[in-house]
């Protein structure tokens, strides 16, 4: 019973604004984003990034909410790799013309991992 209680520790998380969407991120996990900032799209894998648009940070029972963002908060991570989404196929059938058409597109996504969340410390620089 004691081992089970140790595994169910509630860790801290942050909500960040990236690519026009809000993500709930935790250290040690990876996430996929469609619209990453353009200057980071061209960089290769294992590039370190820091995201300064932090909306909320929860650490244990303490919650800090920004308006709109927290001042001295930064989420640091690294880009794992660039990849493509599953293909979206669009088919058209024109009645009475015996013609059919299909088009497809694959959006590019970036997979990144979160290393740490900093708030009100010397490591919280938005660079």
Curated annotation (Swiss-Prot):
Cited function: This protein binds to 23S rRNA.
Protein name: Large ribosomal subunit protein bL21c
SUPFAM superfamilies reported for this sequence: L21p-like (SSF141091)
Family: Belongs to the bacterial ribosomal protein bL21 family.
Record GO terms (molecular function): rRNA binding; structural constituent of ribosome
Species: Adiantum capillus-veneris
Subunit structure: Part of the 50S ribosomal subunit.
Principal location: plastid
GO cellular component, as recorded: chloroplast; ribonucleoprotein complex; ribosome
Location within or outside the cell: Plastid, Chloroplast
Keywords: Chloroplast, Plastid, Ribonucleoprotein, Ribosomal protein, RNA-binding, rRNA-binding
